[in-house]
Amino acid sequence: MNRALDDEVRRLLKIKNYMARKRVEFHRQEWFRYKKLGDAWRKPRGKHSKLREHLSRRPPIVDAGFRSPAKVRGMHPSGYYEVLVYNLKDIENIDPKIQAARIASSVGSRKREEIAKRCAELNIKVLN
């Protein structure tokens, strides 16, 4: 965990982790009924839609209450913000106190090794 984090951020990261584990999968209305419908969320807009009206025995609907705390939104569980790195030039823009590097999947093994070595010199955490 990032040592520079204050107690408030640590507490919010724990809450974010807890909320992520409890969050349900949101499926579109009647996704199970027709093969042509994907299960990706679509907001129900029908005039008589039971899901839109939040009737009982219906799956939960996407709502602001399911979001993680604003202060830690987009933050890695380690307490750093992720920065996607493609080459050595990208490393120079990273602030090691609040950001961590994630090497892109398209980077080959030779360049990946160079990037990891440079990150170690600059005390930048590599997430993968």
Curated annotation (Swiss-Prot):
An annotated Gene Ontology molecular function: structural constituent of ribosome
Transmembrane regions: none
The keyword rRNA processing belongs to this UniProt entry's keyword annotation: no
Domain of life: Archaea
InterPro entries assigned to the protein according to its UniProt record, in alphabetical order: Ribosomal_eL32, Ribosomal_eL32_arc, Ribosomal_eL32_CS, Ribosomal_eL32_sf
GO biological process: translation
GO CC terms, sorted: cytosolic large ribosomal subunit
Matching Pfam families: Ribosomal_L32e (PF01655)
Keywords: Ribonucleoprotein, Ribosomal protein
The keyword Chloroplast is annotated on this UniProt entry: no
Database matches in PROSITE patterns: RIBOSOMAL_L32E
HAMAP family reported for this sequence: Ribosomal_eL32
UniProt record similarity statement: Belongs to the eukaryotic ribosomal protein eL32 family.
Name of this chain's protein: Large ribosomal subunit protein eL32
The organism's taxonomic lineage, starting at the top: Archaea, Methanobacteriati, Thermoplasmatota, Thermoplasmata, Thermoplasmatales
